[in-house]
Amino acid sequence: LLAPRHRLCLPAVSPVDARFTVFDQTEGTWRLLCSSRSNAMVAGLSCEEMGFLRALAHSELDVRTVGANGTSGFFCVDEGRLPHAQRLLEVISVCDCPRGRFLATVCQDCGRRKLPVDRIVGGQDSSLGRWPWQVSLRYDGAHLCGGSLLSGDWVLTAAHCFPERNRVLSRWRVFTGAVAQDSPHGLQLAVQAVVYHGGYLPFQDPNSEENSNDIALVHLSSPLPFTEYIQPVCLPAACQALVDGKVCTVTGWGNMQYYGQQAGVLQEARVPIISNDVCNGPDFYGNQIKPKMFCAGYPEGGIDACQGDSGGPFVCEDSIFRTIVSWGTGCALAQKPGVYTKVGDFREWIFQVIKTHSEASGMVTQL
């Protein structure tokens, strides 16, 4: 192996033959990943790197048989470092791969939804199948928060949805597969466990105004069946960054206006990402926006998430889950846009929780 001196990003899987490739930014070329004895572990890490929850299958192909298909050369895995790696890109480097055999992998699908393709104030009614990962988290039958399906049995949401007064798990239900809250066609499942981030300070000090790490995972009592109206969302790949000004969509059944009624039908609204420099300005939030948060909305207000949208998704056109609705001042106020948790900054936390807490029950904390 050569020293890992190349800048790497943008892993991808070919839709034709499932070959796994990594873009070498230094050379401006795509490289194949040389097959090894650790293909199963590498396949899992590869899928995580791209934002998928897990690998479903893997195999090896021979470049002399199937061709290079626009790729140029290989990366090899340092198998000694692999068991301790959180990112595949940390343990690969350019190599010769003399056998010419490379990894192909199939990841759990995500992001499928019906097209065409507004806590939502100023939004519009959504239609069935447009946001099939959206769930309603209900306590004693009442909608409290939104969430997003990551798999058939894991939901990503906000930690602040689970204060001490709402921790009897038998009273929680997860509702999905419908856009109307009173739809008889949606599915409702019980909750086995809630794992919230141990760094969410308001759970340690009720007077804390620090809202970083506002993230939690809900493990369902049994897996949901995937249908046209129930699908998992895609997590961001390891190297995907938020782009200031990019317009994405926030969805939820939250209040239609501040202290107003909750939406009976799922709402959707398109809002632009605001830079943290602007959002931390004295006229906005005055340095309350921490590195793992960001703002989205319009400086003049009018369109925003609101109470009851917390925990729900902020998704871009590529069906990649960028953030979780976290907090804000009022709803749709001028210079007080919605504040969101950056999901990409918690990828390793998400994967670790799912790997280590599949048998857990009750309320669990995980740093």
Question: Where do the PLM segments sit?
Answer:
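Extracellular "complement/coagulation-type" protease architecture
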Residues: 1-310, 315-367
